[in-house]
Amino acid sequence: MTITRTLQIVNKKGLHARASRKLAELALGYDNTRISVRKESDEADARSLMDLMMLGAGIGDEVEVETLGPQAEEAMAAVE
């Protein structure tokens, strides 16, 4: 199963180190489900702290989050 949603960054510091770490830790908890984050033409594996930070997503930016795998619904709910 694949779920894709467009989400807006609401953290006033954007997807900075702490927020990226929380998302990476969450993604690592889903062994059989891939979580990816896209901003414009750049894509990050949510398991990679560096990939997430390199997106440079700031407050108000829209990102596309995709979950793929048997726990896609649960993973998307956790991200949202």
Predicted features along the sequence, with ranges:
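Detector for methionine-enriched segments
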Residues: 1, 50-54, 76
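Intrinsic-disorder/low-complexity, polar/charged segments enriched in Ser/Thr/Lys/Arg/Asp/Glu/Gln
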Residues: 2-6, 62-64
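Compact, glycine-rich, soluble single-domain proteins
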Residues: 8-55
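C-terminal structural segments of small proteins and small subunits
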Residues: 55-80
